[in-house]
Amino acid sequence: MNSILDQDIMFLPGVGPKKKEILSKELGINSYSDLLEYYPYKYVDRSKVFHISELNADMPFVQLKGKILSYDEIDTGKRNKLLVAHFSDGYGVADLIWYRGAQYIMKTYRVGTEYLVFGKPTVFNGRFQFTHPDMDDATNLQISEMGMQPYYSLTENLRKRGYTSRSIEKMTKQLVTILPPLPETLPSHIVDRLHLVSRDAAVRMIHYPHSHQEMQKAQVRLKFEELFYVQLNIIRYATDQRRKFRGYVFNRIADIFNGFYAHHLPFELTGAQKRVMHEIRADMCSGRQMNRLLQGDVGSGKTLVALMTMLIALDNGYQACMMAPTEILAEQHLQTICDFLQGMDIRVELLTGIVKGKKREKILADLATGDIQILVGTHAILEDPVVFRRLGVAVIDEQHRFGVAQRAKLWNKSENPPHILVMTATPIPRTLAMTIYGDLDVSVIDELPPGRKPIQTLHKFDTQLTSLYQSIRRQINLGRQVYIVFPLIKESEKSDLKNLEEGYETLKQAFPEFKLSKIHGKMKSAEKEVEMEQFVKDETQILVATTVIEVGVNVPNASVMVILDAQRFGLSQLHQLRGRVGRGSDQSYCILVTNYKLSEETRKRIDIMCDTNDGFRIAEADLKLRGPGDLEGTQQSGMAFDLKIANIARDGQLVQLARNEAQEIIDNDPQCNAPQNALLWNRLKELKKTHINWAAIS
């Protein structure tokens, strides 16, 4: 990379130390390179001029050409006067509005001079208005040369200091004019085959495209490059791991697995479960460590697949463990596994933080001798005193709850690293899985066991609570249980969110004949355990909770999930909460309660929830609505996102294309030392040193 790109931004004419400090703090811009990579978030075509007579209030940004007729200053009773400029283009009159800077505006934009005005038209008292429009002297500017105007994101602090998108645009334009030609950062054969523009052309066109076509060409080139280096790094890392870590060869299927399959399997495996078991078997016979991500919606049978995987380890003379993020989840996994294995001579034990004294000592001793074959627990399994005789398989449930360093400790529990099976009930779209879990092989259970009744999801408004309470009462009288979820534990001053404490009291009055439990994030673990245990044992009929119940709780008798203020939740959260019901044979319901003031995006979320139970469809929609950074678990996944221009949700085809090209490079140069690829490996080193966080995954 040219050394000029490493130049401190303070040396760009017009910036200096003070502006540099603000740009660094607010936008992370410290160098010329940072400014070049601060890409526009949108563009507006400035080559067209509208007449005022053509306008309507539904138009987005438009451009006018005309003269200021006069100014009016209006006293609003506040410190700054409102400034109104009456603007005419010969086809009509519009008002230009400024809430501050009146003296500067009147001095800069003079009556009778012709200007280009650019902004969003609104209507007030039958007249079009433009608030804080962009203004350019029409005599000094050729409209035909303006093309697509870039718009840059700003923080509130920058706006308060008087910065606008145009401020960033001017700095970028100044930098681009002094830049020498930028060197290529992709191999010529990739650039030619994919018909990409050069890096130099892309960087210049992304900030100043003359047309929509130029903008698209620049975006495709820069997005592809960004995704290509992410994929190249992931695939190289995965290849290194496979070469470095041998795996136990488990090619024996014997009495334990066969006995379970023949006599203890509760139902015929679904086609998806059989397919996943074949994939796992192939991994365990390959001689390399298995690193597999098992995705499956709630109730798809992941735990059964995980158990059968552990039984293969037992058949080959090894132990297995399963880790869950909470004690409640660990206890439920233990119960499920013991139910499956009832009547089989297999010792299963639980190890969590609450197992103390002689019982703990006994478990640790029997683990070291191999007497315990399957250990279920929390992160307590990772503690130093926990030593396995021969750990062959480790199953990790809800993987994002375990940090990279924690998972690495598993490898010290055994001579060779154990086979790793990561389970998640949070469906991960394919493009996202390729990026954040790129070094894990992915298996998907996309089929529910037969006989499961799909959950019915209904949308109700908060004015319909009386009839909703009657429906809840009917369900409880049929012997069912109900979850009622509130979004927050305490009301904030700026929000009208229901307070769980007040809501709990209201519900007690509404249902005096029933018993209620209550759990929220501010309670101590022991208190939550007691309240949850009462609900699990059917001692209480209604559980009032915040989202702390969204992962792992298994109460087959609960058939109704009511989510209050559902407009406050993301799609992924709503789907996870819905997954707490529908675990028994009864028809289950999820009721989404909202107010009437719903944004278009919220309506889309509610409609998707009512339309489908398919977690993968919901995850794809969530990714498109919110972007990858908000998806639960991605920030803890181990591959932190630092994408400047690519969008995993919308650029799925480019993700796949980048992965294919990166895979071909690694296939042809597995040692990463071929002279023709020197450019790639040097560029990757540069990226690792600068702004991209390449943490390992599993």
Regions from the PLM with identified roles:
Residues M1-P13, K25, V230, D240:
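Long, highly charged, low-complexity intrinsically disordered interaction regions
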Residues E21-I22, Y248-L294:
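Conserved pre-motif I regulatory segment
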Residues E513, M532-I542, I549-P556, M561-L564, ...:
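Accessory helical-bundle/CTD segments and flexible terminal tails appended to RecA-like ATPase motors
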Residues I74-H264, N668:
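Upstream accessory/linker segments immediately N-terminal to the RecA-like ATPase cores of bacterial MutS
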Residues R275-H278, Q289-I608, Q671:
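Inter-lobe coupling/hinge segments of SF2-like helicase ATPases
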Residues Y38-I68:
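OB-fold nucleic-acid-binding modules
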